[in-house]
């Protein structure tokens, strides 16, 4: 038996062992004589976002009581809007209410309608089960998926137990999507996106929500993961144009210091937005993104640029930029309604100037036409009513995303914080040149921004008419994690000290800030470690609450 056969046999056994642990459930790997895990009630320790706290929460404040009344009054309005969707799907009222916030127990049905999940299920009966079974038998990234699932939303009550029900569903979704869309395969941030949908939707619905989110031209998320996509570069070019017009001093300073694209507020948005702000605000921004589409990305980054303008003009290279990224979080450490008010004003201003979307890409040499790009809404504030469903698997999709920049001469690659690389720009017709990120050993499943850490996450079945969120009786078990300020600064420090990168990965295990127990160590108390060496890359985890919790 040669080396290839031995390696294939080992991987097959490893894959079977991982699948078996999830099938056994959260008690997988424990000795039988330990008995059942003692039940613990979280009635007074779970906040309205589903995060488990070690101490009992204080009584409701007057402001929180006001939020209760507001949530109840909005619930009936959203129910009426869902009942007459054809009337409201393209109305201004839908956008107005999205900026005010969706009630928690309406969010699942509303996301389902916005992403056309029922239509996809009717067009593809039984397809999810087929993809899931194929993924179990042939997944090439199951170790990475298992590792990322173990660190996804671990402070949320739905994902608290290792190998629990929600973790098993999350594994199934990621395995099925890897098989369904081989162009994207698996990227680390997909686990957080899928976990977000699982908090509000059943397993199969969450899978089709992930498919629609990446496939639809309206949201353009596939361009952040596909090696053929151009979403990031198009938005980056448009951001430079908008900032140069509205804030020429800021843009001039960026050009003078030659700050790389990874260090732009767009990059900070991708890496920090969902980890460095309160969960409630993250949810509000996610609602707006699903309703508005990619047009919401530019106003969000523009707000951060405006708030941090003075600090940005004093920034240069990695060290100071790390401090800016840290302060970028403070942009969002404000009242949720205030942030959404400024976001709405920024959206209207950019829409009026037709700066909310990049221009269409020019046709490539030898092609007859370029990929169509959603048009800016001009002075109107209307939501597109026609949300196109993909005709089939992503293999038949048109070229996924545009690139707004004109043809340029080649440039040398520039290393950026966190291990990412600013991609070289080649003239039209030379797209076959290998990516610098791959040349330096970057993961093949991701693209320009190699680290999205998490996405918003919330419970699915809160009843606003019953006891308020703090005292709600959750019947499932799960969790949430967030990125500490030290971890936000770590990528830049490691970029300046490459020799310390591997050493820090082994010397600084992540800990649970509430319990003082490492995530990995706590999981090992519940289950036996996977046999064989781990061939996946290392990554640090942290679980401190972000500001505003």
UniProtKB/Swiss-Prot annotation:
**What GO molecular function annotation could you give as one example from this UniProt entry?**
GTPase activator activity
Q: Where in the cell is it found?
A: Cell membrane
Q: Which domain of life is it from?
A: Eukaryota
Q: What is its main location?
A: membrane
What is this protein's function per UniProt?
Answer: Acts as a GTPase activating protein for RAB5. Does not act on RAB4 or RAB11.
Report the PANTHER family cross-referenced here: RAB GTPASE-ACTIVATING PROTEIN 1-LIKE, RAB-GAP TBC DOMAIN-CONTAINING PROTEIN
Name used for this protein in its record: TBC1 domain family member 3K
The protein's gene is named TBC1D3K
């Amino acid at each position: 038996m040669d080396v290839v056969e031995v390696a294939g046999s080992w991987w097959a056994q490893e894959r079977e062992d991982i699948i078996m642990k999830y099938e056994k459930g959260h008690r997988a790997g424990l000795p039988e004589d330990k008995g059942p895990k003692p039940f613990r009630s979280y009635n007074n320790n779970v906040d309205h976002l589903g995060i488990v706290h070690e101490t009992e929460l204080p009584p409701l404040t007057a402001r929180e009581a006001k939020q209760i009344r507001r949530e109840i009054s909005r619930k009936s309005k959203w129910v009426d809007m869902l009942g007459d969707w054809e009337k409201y799907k393209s109305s201004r009222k839908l956008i107005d209410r999205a900026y005010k916030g969706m009630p928690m127990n309406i969010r699942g049905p509303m996301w389902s309608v916005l992403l056309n999940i029922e239509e996809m299920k009717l067009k593809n009966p039984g397809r999810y089960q087929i993809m899931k079974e194929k993924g179990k038998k042939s997944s090439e990234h199951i170790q990475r998926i298992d590792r990322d699932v173990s660190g996804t939303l671990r402070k949320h009550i739905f994902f608290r137990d290792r190998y629990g029900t929600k973790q098993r569903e999350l594994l199934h979704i990621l395995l099925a999507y890897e098989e369904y869309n081989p162009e994207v395969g698996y990227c680390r941030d997909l686990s957080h996106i899928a976990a977000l949908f699982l908090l509000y939707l059943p397993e199969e619905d969450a899978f089709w929500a992930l498919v629609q989110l990446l496939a639809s031209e309206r949201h353009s998320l596939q361009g952040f993961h596909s090696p053929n996509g151009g979403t990031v570069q198009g938005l980056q070019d448009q951001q430079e144009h908008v900032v140069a017009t509205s804030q020429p001093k800021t843009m001039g300073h960026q050009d003078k210091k030659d700050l790389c694209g990874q260090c732009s507020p767009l990059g900070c948005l991708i890496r920090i937005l969902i980890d460095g702000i309160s969960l409630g605000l993250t949810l509000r921004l996610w609602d707006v993104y699903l309703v508005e589409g990619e047009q919401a990305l530019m106003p969000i980054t523009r707000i951060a640029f405006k708030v941090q303008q003075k600090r940005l003009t004093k920034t240069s290279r990695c060290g100071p930029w790390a401090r800016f990224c840290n302060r970028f979080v403070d942009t969002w450490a404000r009242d949720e309604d205030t942030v959404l008010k400024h976001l709405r004003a920024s959206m209207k201003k950019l829409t009026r100037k037709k700066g909310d979307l990049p221009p269409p890409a020019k046709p490539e040499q030898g092609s007859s036409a370029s990929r169509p790009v959603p048009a800016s809404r001009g002075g109107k504030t209307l939501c597109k009513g026609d949300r196109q469903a993909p005709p089939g698997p992503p293999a038949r999709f048109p070229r996924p995303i545009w690139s707004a920049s004109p043809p340029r001469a080649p440039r040398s690659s520039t290393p950026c914080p966190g291990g990412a690389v600013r991609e070289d720009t080649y003239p039209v017709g030379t797209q076959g040149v290998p990516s610098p990120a791959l040349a330096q050993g970057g993961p093949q499943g991701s693209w320009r921004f190699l680290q999205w850490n998490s996405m918003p996450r919330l419970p699915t079945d809160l009843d606003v008419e019953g006891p308020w969120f703090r005292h709600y009786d959750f019947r499932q078990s799960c969790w949430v994690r967030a990125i500490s300020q030290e971890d936000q600064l770590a990528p830049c420090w490691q970029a300046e000290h490459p020799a310390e990168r591997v050493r820090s990965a082994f010397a600084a295990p992540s800990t649970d800030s509430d319990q003082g127990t490492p995530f990995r160590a706590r999981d090992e108390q519940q289950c036996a470690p996977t046999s064989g060496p781990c061939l996946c890359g290392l990554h640090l985890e942290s679980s401190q609450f972000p500001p505003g919790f």
